[in-house]
Amino acid sequence: MVQIETERLVLREYTPDDWPAVLAYQSDSRYLRYYPWSERDAEAVREFVAWCVARQAEAPRNVFQLAITLPATGGRLLGSCGVRVNDRARREGNIGYELDPEYWGNGYATEAARAMLRYGFEQLGLHRIWAQCNADNTASAHLLEKLGMRREAHFRECDQFKGRWWDSFIYAMLDHEWRAAPVG
């Protein structure tokens, strides 16, 4: 079982009972803006949480998707953050994160993503970690830059949903960059 504590957060394994908290924030229109679906239902969220729980038992484990909780609020679930090992031979993985819009602007997503970078480089021994974000999501792009990740690609009109084409950015960091200038 993986549990990561930061200055303000606890990133912990999902449990099946987490789905109502996930549904609450994934139903917010601000959250839904950059996702292909226009609404979330209980079944889809239960499937997501069950998928996260099932990854905990895999061997070797390649997906470390953790619930972001805030001890100061009694352990309220604020979002999700994870690192996935994409290619063990090349020691490559990616990170992703999402946060309840009620908690945006407090640095929680940055703190959680930094913890997952640290876990990926220092515990999993990854060489390269990348992240993808919607190019219109300037807050997410800024977060990745604040972590010290470099923009490596701009994919133009690579996704189509909600009646339009969307661009994506790819950011990445290498293990020697992490060691040379640890972010946090």
Predicted regions and their residues:
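Positions that flank functional sites
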Residues: 41, 136, 159
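Conserved acetyl-CoA-binding loop-helix of GNAT-fold acetyltransferases
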Residues: 97, 105-122, 138-146
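A generic structured-segment signal
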Residues: 80, 94, 109-117, 155, ...
